Amino acid sequence: MKTEYDILIIGAGPGGAMAAKTAAEEGLSVLMVEKRPAIGTPVRCAEGVGKELLHEFIGPDPAWISADIERATIVGPDGTSMSLEAQRAGNEVGYILDRKVFDRALVWQAAEAGAEVQVKTRAIAPILENGFVRGARLQGYGTTTDVRAKVVIAADGVESKFARWCGVDTAVPVNEIETCAQYLLTDIDIDESATVFYLGNEIAPEGYAWVFPKGKRTANVGLGISGKKNLPGNRPIDYLNRFVEKNFPNGKTIECIVGGVSVCTPLASTVSDGLMIVGDAARISDPLTGGGIYNAMYSGRLAAQVAIECIKRGDCSRAALAAYDQQWRVSAMGKALDRNYKIKEYFIRQSDEKLNALAHSFKKINMEKFSTLELIKELIKHNPKLLFELKTLRDSLNS
């Protein structure tokens, strides 16, 4: 490990790996550090991602695909269900990954492109000069080293500390973070080609439960609830235990993971002087689903592309790096974040009675292709009692 690079990346998840690969392919010197001793572990993710979205970055490999999903099923509080086949669901169906293998594949590609990778190495402080981020103090393998860089990319996940140390407000209100628990269950009866989403305030208040197939009679079974609902006796693990006891009483637990995901609006700015913030660290996980793999990869690649140009011009100021912030906000991803935040805010306010009414009307809807706006228009037709609320939601999405 040298003490000076073009780009220093904090975190080796999908966002960091895409940034490292993109920059290294252009000949820049890149160091990516990961605080954990192994890439891809521990997994804190339901591991689902849309096929078309993923193909934008990497071709499918059976080594890291656990299941190829053909449909998505939504189940209302009273058990009413609606299924969307792949041709109608679009990015709501895709692959269930093996993140341990997938993350390592991405980092391997970054290393092959020329990026240096250091595991068991954490950033413990930024190097700041008159408010300009000039690198980071790294600690690993019993030593502490100051590493300077023209640009630092913070890709250190939902628990990101680095951007905060640099003066960026990264706080998430407790009601805008989902606290989650998940079991990897085996010996259970499931549709191995479908993801299933369960709604209901008794199941997962202000969140949802999921069943994501991982292979033969095996699935990730988990849920997320609003942080403000996380109370003694009603923690995510408590809700999950009740859900599993009801739906998979004979399932055998292979693994248990817990974690959190932000469902807020993105950071007010994802750049500063010498600093760029990507993925969950930038609070750009999907506020409706909590999904973050694609968004991390997209933002990581875009950040590197902008950083490359700024380094070539010799200007890595906030004003120069702002092109990254501006571009992702007007992208399809940025627009989806805005739209899905509004939809999330609508659904978390609904009672089980209203959720059931919506679920019942889903079954009457026949759309050629899944579209959020078309779905809401159809729901308005079938739910006159919810006319005002749904029209307000539709109008906000059109604004």
Swiss-Prot record:
Gene Ontology CC entries for this record: membrane
Pathway(s): Membrane lipid metabolism; glycerophospholipid metabolism
Enzyme class: oxidoreductase
Cofactor: FAD
One biological process term in Gene Ontology: membrane lipid biosynthetic process
Cysteines engaged in disulfide bonds, as pairs: none
Catalysed reactions, as listed in the record: a 2,3-bis-O-phytanyl-sn-glycerol 1-phospholipid + 8 oxidized 2[4Fe-4S]-[ferredoxin] = a 2,3-bis-O-(geranylgeranyl)-sn-glycerol 1-phospholipid + 8 reduced 2[4Fe-4S]-[ferredoxin] + 16 H(+); 2,3-bis-O-(phytanyl)-sn-glycerol 1-phosphate + 8 oxidized 2[4Fe-4S]-[ferredoxin] = 2,3-bis-O-(geranylgeranyl)-sn-glycerol 1-phosphate + 8 reduced 2[4Fe-4S]-[ferredoxin] + 16 H(+); a 2,3-bis-O-phytanyl-sn-glycerol 1-phospholipid + 8 A = a 2,3-bis-O-(geranylgeranyl)-sn-glycerol 1-phospholipid + 8 AH2; CDP-2,3-bis-O-(geranylgeranyl)-sn-glycerol + 8 AH2 = CDP-2,3-bis-O-(phytanyl)-sn-glycerol + 8 A
Cofactor comment: Binds 1 FAD per subunit.
Key words, A-Z: FAD, Flavoprotein, Lipid biosynthesis, Lipid metabolism, Oxidoreductase, Phospholipid biosynthesis, Phospholipid metabolism
Record InterPro entries: DGGGPL_reductase, FAD/NAD-bd_sf, Geranylgeranyl_Rdtase_fam, Geranylgeranyl_reductase, GGR_cat
Ranges in a coiled coil: none
Highest taxon above the source species: Archaea
A UniProt-annotated Pfam family: GGR_cat
Binding locations of FAD: G15, E34, C45, A46, G48, R99, A123, D280, G292, I293
Keyword Disulfide bond among record annotations: no
Keyword Lipid biosynthesis: yes
GO molecular function ontology, one term from the record: flavin adenine dinucleotide binding
EC number: 1.3.7.11
Extra facts: Reduction reaction proceeds via syn addition of hydrogen for double bonds.
Role this protein plays: Is involved in the reduction of 2,3-digeranylgeranylglycerophospholipids (unsaturated archaeols) into 2,3-diphytanylglycerophospholipids (saturated archaeols) in the biosynthesis of archaeal membrane lipids. Catalyzes the formation of archaetidic acid (2,3-di-O-phytanyl-sn-glyceryl phosphate) from 2,3-di-O-geranylgeranylglyceryl phosphate (DGGGP) via the hydrogenation of each double bond of the isoprenoid chains.
Family statement drawn from the similarity comment of this UniProt entry: Belongs to the geranylgeranyl reductase family. DGGGPL reductase subfamily.
Descriptive protein name: Digeranylgeranylglycerophospholipid reductase
Lineage, top ranks: Archaea, Methanobacteriati, Methanobacteriota, Stenosarchaea group, Methanomicrobia
